[in-house]
Amino acid sequence: MKIDLNTIFPSSCKEYIPGKIYKNIKIGMRKVSFNNDTESILIYDTGGPHSDQDIQTNINNGIKKLRVNWITDRQDVEYYDRHTINTNSSTAFPLQNNKALKSKNDKPVTQMFYAKNNIITPEMEYVAIRENSLIQKLLSHTPNTIIPEITPELVRQEVAAGRAIIPANINHPESEPMIIGKNFLVKINANIGNSAVSSDINNEVYKMIYAIIYGADTVMDLSTGSHIHNTREWIIRNSPVPIGTVPIYQALNKVNGIVGELNFNIFKETLIEQAEQGVDYFTIHAGVLKKYIQYTTNRLTGIVSRGGAIIAQWCSIHNKENFLYTNFEEICDIMKSYDIAFSLGDGLRPGSIADANDKAQFLELKTLGELTDIAWKHDCQVMIEGPGHVPMHLIKENVEKQMYFCKEAPFYTLGPLTTDIAPGYDHITSAIGAAMIGWYGTSMLCYVTPKEHLGLPNLNDVKNGVITYKIAAHAADLAKGNPSAYIRDYALSYARFNFRWYDQFNLSLDPETAKSFHDESLPSEHAKSAHFCSMCGPKFCSMKLTHQLQLNSTE
């Protein structure tokens, strides 16, 4: 499948900004040139080499291992033979490495460990430069404004305090560092993955590429069908963004879907297997305690988290406490050896408006706060997953409780959906909640596609989900006063008022769609310089009338 970058992002090219502390690092941005050829702006870009027109990528080869030297130069890791590698299968990634990296002497190799020890890593400088992508442009428009710059030292402080994470497994050197935290740009995640009904590795890889080109900051592989290991290997080797998983899915697959046969040893084996591949963050449902399950029985929709339901059933079958909870410190030992971030799962999240903000949900959240403290003692990076289905008036309470219980660890929410009545449009019902919860302080938003509750998303659904959530995240950034967000709105509005149609299209989140809508009624090239559109026509265009008014006032 060929992706035409000239069609997706016209008048754009990749530009690389060098580091100042680490001179050898180069941060890729998307440069959008204006039609007058004298101005341009740099936009945060998540596509890696896939969005660079000068690089020919081939999914059979994977992408450049950007961070190998950064990782090995710290001299705190060593190579060893991977426990699980699958090279004989017809679906195996052709260039698998039979070696993996791990920390030496069981010492932490996490970004949090370095941050606590006052070390600014290349990853920290990288994300600081990315976050500042549009600030210089804003300064040129408002020279007397004092704008706080995001510095590598600020990044270090936020990571050390646990208010931000940089998911960056040492076995995923292809990843371009990014940061998740309430004092940075709101990020979005795209879920992909096969199912028992539909399994195609190439299709999942292209879903990942499609998602990141359009702006997904991380991707979760939630595969539950065939070839889970190999699907993940292909995705990671081609991904410049952090990859997350829910390891309990593969652990259950290993026991043929029989929940009662799950145990911690199988789960631990799965964690190490995925750690060696390079997974950057794990969803771990360690907060689903046996005593909380009783509070879900009177819910309208019960337990809707797949991981939460698996753990609840296991506890019920064995009449034992959640083995993820009882073995949590051993899990921390694995995480800190590879720098895998925790995404503490909300296994008891509400699956309907009727169940929002109930006792089960908030009991689990409190436990996640306690687990966060334990993980931090091991220097593990942590973010907290959140709901779900929540009406607008109850959204703020979720953020307030999460900030209190979890001491401002980054919040990562699925929407939330603000109503249950719109199957087929749940990307919209959830984007309403996502924009609000992002404004209140959530750090990352998990996208919802139009197929939510209905089926497995295809490429077009992935695009629609990503664009919808880029809108929600950007709206939240504007509301929070993030200076990097403002300049793009300013530039597009300026182009709109001056009837610079191509600049309007090219500055938008989806230039191809914007231009196609304009072409439906005014397809000619002449119309691309017209001082009206088909909505108002030449006589009723308010902006054209305003231009005339301004002209008259100066005469």
Swiss-Prot record:
It holds the Pfam family ThiC-associated. Disulfide bonds: none annotated. Transmembrane segments: none annotated. Zn(2+) binds at H389, H453. InterPro entries: ThiC, ThiC-associated_dom, ThiC/Bza_core_dom, ThiC/BzaA/B. GO terms for molecular function: 4 iron, 4 sulfur cluster binding; carbon-carbon lyase activity; zinc ion binding. This is Phosphomethylpyrimidine synthase. It comes from Ehrlichia ruminantium (strain Gardel). GO terms for cellular component: cytosol. Catalyzes the synthesis of the hydroxymethylpyrimidine phosphate (HMP-P) moiety of thiamine from aminoimidazole ribotide (AIR) in a radical S-adenosyl-L-methionine (SAM)-dependent reaction. Belongs to the ThiC family. One of its GO terms (biological process) is thiamine biosynthetic process. Substrate binds at N191, M220, Y249, H285, S305, R306, G307, D346, G347, L348, R349, E385, Y412. Binds 1 [4Fe-4S] cluster per subunit. The cluster is coordinated with 3 cysteines and an exchangeable S-adenosyl-L-methionine. Homodimer. Its EC number is 4.1.99.17.
